Amino acid sequence: MERDKLMTGLHNLVSVVGDRVATLQGFAELLRSTGSYRWVGLYDVDHAARIVKNIVWSGSGAPEYPTFPITMGLTGAAISSRETVNVGEVAADPRYLTAFGTTSSEIIVPVFDGTGENVVGTIDVESEKPNAFSEDVQSLLEACSNVIRPLWRR
């Protein structure tokens, strides 16, 4: 993945004061094209309602689960552990919620609130390739999470 291209593009998107949804849509599209991934989605985490809700997505189709309980799937694991969940072969992980039959690997990166304590959103990236998300890619996605964090301030 082209780290410099992604980070420069992301900083440019976030620096423009504008619509949150449009900015996140731009990020999803930038990330998907830069990394050659099959699908990227960004989600809000509503702790009061105990749900996760899709904000935007980029890829070959709408999310199979646009809204789901906060405890479900790989996303639920990332929220409860407050850590990135990186699964190299989703078929072998019982937490995986099948959305696209061609997904082989998936990474869920939490987005934290301003205090760094609460998960307020997630970045969900899926690939048709097994083990698509190296430690370097995971580190880059976690850096992206920090850059987009202000978009969750309400």
Where are these regions (language model features)?
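Helix-loop-beta substructure at the N-terminus of cytosolic sensory domains
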Residues: 16-54
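Short hydrophobic/aromatic beta-strand element in the GNAT-like acyltransferase core
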Residues: 39, 108, 122
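Juxtadomain coupling helices with adjacent low-complexity linkers
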Residues: 3-7, 11, 121, 127-154
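Short loop/turn motifs at secondary-structure junctions and domain boundaries
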Residues: 34, 98-104
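Short, solvent-exposed loop/turn segments that connect beta-strands within catalytic domains
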Residues: 48-51, 114-118
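Regulatory sensory and allosteric helical modules in signal-transduction proteins
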Residues: 45-48, 55-99
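Conserved beta-strand segments that form the floor/walls of ligand-binding pockets within enzyme
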Residues: 86, 110, 124
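A short, aliphatic-rich beta-strand micro-motif
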Residues: 105-114
